[in-house]
Amino acid sequence: MDLKEKIRIIDGFPKEGISFKDITTLIGDGEGLKASIDMFVEYLKDKNVDLIVGPEARGFIFGVPVAYALGAGFVPVRKPGKLPGETISVNYDLEYGSDSLQIHKDSIKKGQRVAIVDDLLATGGTVEGVAKLVEEAGGEVVSLAFLIELIDLKGRDKLGDYDVISLTQYDI
């Protein structure tokens, strides 16, 4: 299945000059959602993944069903103040500033094999921060998997030697 046929493009959102890739049409279509999950699972099934890590919020949409299909656990990555208990944090750069993400300190055990699953690879700043969190917790990042990659933003270049897959690619 061509997943691009299920993703709506909205020009001028959230501001003029942006071509927004709206995944709500894909996740609202049972066939499209199943196909995207199946594609992630097919790619990750031989990587011996212990955990799927997903950044809020759309990483949850794809990460949980992928974890379930692989028999792996799921670790949510949240903005500060959203997780109870002891957390570890990372600051990361955005195009116009910086932000912070957290995971529970005990959510990843030393040596666990982790795939990070998210909806979008743009500049790579968010996933680079998530990968640092995983590694700080003792995990080994074995793959970074995305529904959409905006290739003109060169996020893949920022991610060095990580194994990166995207199910669809768009020019900006």
From Swiss-Prot:
Catalytic activity: AMP + diphosphate = 5-phospho-alpha-D-ribose 1-diphosphate + adenine
CC per GO annotation: cytoplasm
Cross-referenced Gene3D superfamilies: 3.40.50.2020
Listed transmembrane segments: none
GO molecular function: adenine binding; adenine phosphoribosyltransferase activity; AMP binding
Pathway(s): Purine metabolism; AMP biosynthesis via salvage pathway; AMP from adenine: step 1/1
Top-level enzyme category: transferase
Keyword entries, A-Z: Cytoplasm, Glycosyltransferase, Purine salvage, Transferase
Pfam families registered for this protein in UniProt: Pribosyltran
GO BP annotations, alphabetical order: adenine salvage; AMP salvage; purine ribonucleoside salvage
Chief place where the protein resides: cytoplasm
EC number(s) recorded for this UniProt protein: 2.4.2.7
Compartments reported by the entry: Cytoplasm
Membership in a protein family: Belongs to the purine/pyrimidine phosphoribosyltransferase family.
Subunit structure of this chain's protein: Homodimer.
Functional note: Catalyzes a salvage reaction resulting in the formation of AMP, that is energically less costly than de novo synthesis.
Protein name per the record: Adenine phosphoribosyltransferase
Species per Swiss-Prot/TrEMBL record: Clostridium botulinum (strain Eklund 17B / Type B)
